[in-house]
Amino acid sequence: MKTIICLFTIAIAAMAAVTNLSNVLKNGNDNFTARMFTEVVKNNPGKSIVLSAFSVLPPLAQLALASDGETHEELLKAIGFPDDDAIRTEFASKSRDLRSIKGVELKMANKVYVHDGGKLDENFAVVSRDVFNSDVQNIDFSKNTVAAKSINDWVEENTNNRIKDLVNPDSLSSATAAVLVNAIYFKGAWSSKFDERLTSDRDFYVSKDKTIKVPMMYKRGDYKYGESAVLNAQLIEIPYKGDQSSLIVVLPKDKDGITQLQEALKDPKTLETAQQSMYSTEVDLYLPKFKIETETNLKDVLSNMNVNKIFNNDAQITRLLKGESLSVSEAIQKAFIEINEEGAEAAAANAFTMTRSSKVYVRPPIVFNANKPFYYALQVDGVIMFNGIFIN
């Protein structure tokens, strides 16, 4: 049996909004994000991470439309969609919304690489073009080094050179039928930038009893702020230009509270409920500058999320290529994020391989000092585009 490889890339920096995402897509993304976050954290103990569950959804949705039977039902359940019509409607709308974003650099690109001699199923070709705005290219996978370079060059171009070497040539062979690639890149700026002159090295608690020095940014400003007893944490929302996207930071009250926080975040409604009680107030904000890169083996992660059948030899992916039944042999995500005084920049890439984002106050400002491990999420119009934890 021929195989498919799925690759995911995401690049994001201080973003503006995707509008009118329906509850179906938002709820599906919230649940998928919470589950994927839990698994990626589990696989990276004691490490800072960045991931984008949002970028995994389009390839999985494409595979759902290309599959039958139990594989089809398993994929629909995983991404939280009731049927194929909902996939077509929601992702077509999302693609249009992304292309209409003004004032920031925001790109979302999809591409399907098909083995020489292979041809997309006519219906899948139409859906790929009209729903996912996906390009198609035939390629000789037996020339694995040349094929990998071609795919990696496309990924670099669509993530502003932030994601490199996504595909290992050794993962490609004459048995490779197709490679599904998704890339997202975003770049923007804070609504109100941090002053670089106020950035200084300050203590950061990597554990309850151990500190290191990190470059800590500082700004006094008007932010949405809240506290949650359920999360045992402070929350702050830092807006990007356009005020439709923001960075949410959830800071445990205890120096060693990150594990408890991660456990609470398994329920996506917990964070949503905490955000609903946030209010505007003056805050003294201390936030580390940081840069994180994470590579995730999505085959392991998805399997732990009960997405298994696409990896089996009897995967029933029969509507992607004409006359060929396929399975997924490899699924990889590379992700990148950088937070600094100007804003944020992040990148991620995914690949699936198949075989045949002044007021006067009577009280002093609230202090939000992110000097211990914390959770962050970049939201666009209330939808989590990528998230992670910063530990050191």
Swiss-Prot record:
Hemolymph. The record marks 359-360 as: Reactive bond. Residues 1-16 form the signal peptide. PROSITE patterns: SERPIN (PS00284). It is found in: Secreted. GO terms for cellular component: extracellular space. CDD domains: serpin1K-like. Keywords: Protease inhibitor, Secreted, Serine protease inhibitor, Signal. One of its GO terms (molecular function) is serine-type endopeptidase inhibitor activity. SUPFAM superfamilies: Serpins. InterPro entries: Serpin_CS (IPR023795), Serpin_dom (IPR023796), Serpin_fam (IPR000215), Serpin_sf (IPR036186), Serpin_sf_1 (IPR042178), Serpin_sf_2 (IPR042185). The keyword Secreted applies. Its main location: secreted. Transmembrane segments: none annotated. It holds the Pfam family Serpin. May play a role in the prophenoloxidase activating system in the silkworm hemolymph. Belongs to the serpin family. The reactive center loop (RCL) extends out from the body of the protein and directs binding to the target protease. The protease cleaves the serpin at the reactive site within the RCL, establishing a covalent linkage between the serpin reactive site and the active site of the protease. The resulting inactive serpin-protease complex is highly stable. This is Antitrypsin. It comes from Bombyx mori. The lineage of its organism: Eukaryota, Metazoa, Ecdysozoa, Arthropoda, Hexapoda.
